[in-house]
Amino acid sequence: MNEKESGREHTGIAAEMKVLLREPPLLIGILAVFLLFAVFIIYPFVKILLVPASADWMRAVTDKEFIEVFSHTIFSSFVATATAIVFGFIFAYGVNYTNMPCKRFFQVVALLPTMAPSVVSGLAFIMLFGRRGFITWEMLHLKVDLYGPVGLWAAQTIAFFPLAYITISGVLKNISPNLELAAQNLGAKGWYLFRTVTLRLATPGLASAFLLVGINSLADFGNPMLVGGNYHVLATEAYTQVTGAWDLPMGATLSVFLVIPTLIVFFVQRYYLEKNSYVTVTGKPVAGLIRVTAGPAATWCFFTFCMLLSLGILMIIGVVVLFAFTVSFGADYTFTLEYFKEGVINSNVMVNSWVASMSTAAISTVFGIALAFLVLRKKFPGGTVMDFLAMLPVSLPGTFIGLAMILAFNDGPLEMTGTLAIIILGMALRQLPVGYRQAVAGLKQIEGSLEQASTNLGAGSFTTFRKIVLPMLKNSLSVSFVYAFMRSMNTLSTVIFLVSPEWNLASINIMSLANQGFLPTASATAVGIMLVIYLTFGVVKLILRDKINIFDL
């Protein structure tokens, strides 16, 4: 950087500071955000790095057992991620690029697993294919043991397939048909057209899906705990070291090592997308163009695949429901509410989860919109740092965040161990990036001149934010709120270290009950979570008068 450029930079910073000094509430708000980030993000993450001694780091990289656990984590995550992305792409392509029937049915079924805890797929796997599973034992009389890498692969593929489908479908739906039609007019067709045009334009969606599914499968705790058997991964091993071996430094060490592959996935995805261009430069799409679709034979192949996968998803959810409401599934199919009463009505875990999730959704949504407003609409020194810190939790495993929280706030003036506050804090931190990015996307669609006019009329930044920005972001706010609530109700890895006997959560209770063999009660609790999510979503739709629909993908 030469002296001229350096001078311009200093002049720009000075001008930004003058603007902030003329508006003290804005300056105080920015400083408050940085203070919150320092206390609740930087401090816990530094704390977890300082707990392990050099001997712990050395043991983690030399001990054969831990090396094996690390290799298990990478392998199982890669296989599950690859399968989920392939399934998600085929499903999304069938919905968006064919004329197959039942598209609406497929769209709804593909999203059903997102409203259930990810551990439900593992729970259903035990019921259907476990040592006494309904299919393997009751129907086929087979003595098979599918616990381990195979069971983990199947459970994680079903659990995270919806993430891949949602991400890829959004990209495929937004691809303009202009380029595909132009390529077709130039003689490209079939596989060549798909490979050179459609697949290339879908690359950002595939990369984003790889990031989302990869990070979630790496950090998955419930499925490895239920169906992993002796096939240990980093998330479960870190938990075992802390709660079983009482070795907190080693648990912290393994949690930090779990961050390494997730950060690699995150930065590789960012580098690959920045290195290559996927922007269509044909201007606005021409109205009335019809998308190039697959032929009849291919369409029926896609229909068959989507139907089989949808039936598999319905079977998983169906068996959980049947276990919850029958006396003894496989032997006595008499309807009963006893398990539902035990797991939902007579237990406080569902109320705890609802209160924590509603609080988390409100905090992450409002704070995310406020952050987006500051970063996008206000120029101030440190805006890039604020943006980075707001997005940092998306690349961190839940077990890492949870353990960092418990280490940071176990004592001292901000002691929160065993309270509802630390649970909400951990979940809000995990959901903040989603609310922030949703608000950023919404703000980019709003003309900045509206806020400028408000400022010119004498309104301050906070008045403009409250009276102009918030009303115009109502839909974005609603989507963020519903998504954060849904994910918080289902969260497991983030809160596994944060719950206490007084403040236990429904998702944790499912895993605990399943591990003890109480599968019907665990199933009833899972059904309870799904019902709470559906009811909450219905209330939001009623309030907004059908202006939000998460099934429109």
Question: Which functions belong to the PLM regions below?
Answer:
Residues 1-32, 270-308, 541-553:
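Transmembrane alpha-helical segments of polytopic membrane transport and secretion proteins
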Residues 183-184, 454:
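The alpha-helix within a helix-turn-helix
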Residues 189, 276-292, 329-343:
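Juxtamembrane inter-helical linkers in multi-pass membrane proteins
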Residues 221-245, 332, 492-519, 553:
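Glycine-rich helix-loop "coupling/hinge" segments at transmembrane-helix boundaries
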Residues 236-261:
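Helix-loop-helix hairpin linking two adjacent transmembrane segments in secondary transporters
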Residues 175-178, 446-450:
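Short glycine/proline-centered loop/turn elements that form peptide/ligand docking sites
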Residues 14-20, 55-62, 335-344:
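A short amphipathic helical element positioned immediately N-terminal to and/or at the very start
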Residues 21-55, 64-173, 199-222, 253-270, ...:
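Membrane-water interface segments at the C-terminal ends of transmembrane alpha-helices
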